[in-house]
Amino acid sequence: MVIKNKKISPEALCTGLKQKNQTFARNFRNVCMAAKKLGIKGIAKLLWQDLFGGRSLAQWLYLLALSSLPFILEFTNGQAKHDWLGLFASWTGIVCVILVAEGRASNYLFGAVNSAIYLILSFNASFYGEVLTTVYFFIMQPIGLYTWLSNRVNEQDKEEPSHFEAKKLDWRGWLKYLALTALIWIGMGFAYKSIHSHRPFRDSVTDATNGIGQLLMTGLYREQWIFWIATNLFSIYLWWGSNLHIQAMYWVYTLNSIVGWYQWSKAVKKA
């Protein structure tokens, strides 16, 4: 049996790119128009609702319990000097991932602050792989915020709008993202090896899992949580014995990733 490969003509490729650009421009215009219509007070009110609205008592208790752990740890460890950077990195990170699990766009605000602080901590600890990953995270925060807001604004005409619309990967998507994970891991590993890193392919593990996790999160895919779990477990090993706050943060991340997988799986079934 002869299988004929389908060739994409330059005209078809240009048409596809043009359609994507038009969709992006339309969605961006809708987001800007919605923001202009709301005004500063309206945006502040919307942010307040996103942060505090529609949360059950169980969700409030979960948020308060996990987000209080960095403060409990800081003020009960018996050390005279407080690690304020570690404390706020841990707190903003925990709040961020809980908001992600709940499908709240405000997670990106906490994510931006967390990325800035974590960048400093990683640089001071000479974890240069983490530094590069954190720079990528920081850049992705406004992109992710736009994508989530665009999804919300452009789905407002649906009869039954949901707080967020989760998606799941098909087998083709799995193959694509697993291949991309391997490429990033190997590529960054050789890059670190070229600058004589002592652990090139170990450092590049979180580059790959973090990178794909962020892409899937931006695209509203449930499978992001699998990559976050892998990232969290490896990061616990990476920071072991170095910074107590960051270790605790990743343990909480792991727990929240399991919760996030459960919540997003329910959202996928409702979609």
Regions found by a protein language model. Give the residues of each.
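Hydrophobic/aromatic-rich structural module bridging two neighboring secondary-structure elements via a short loop
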Residues: 105-147
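Short, Lys/Arg-rich, polar N-terminal cytosolic tail immediately upstream
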Residues: 2-9, 13-17, 21-52
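Short linear sequence elements within intrinsically disordered, low-complexity coil regions
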Residues: 19, 26-29, 33, 123, ...
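Polytopic alpha-helical membrane-helix bundles and their juxtamembrane interface segments
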Residues: 38-102, 138-141, 148-271
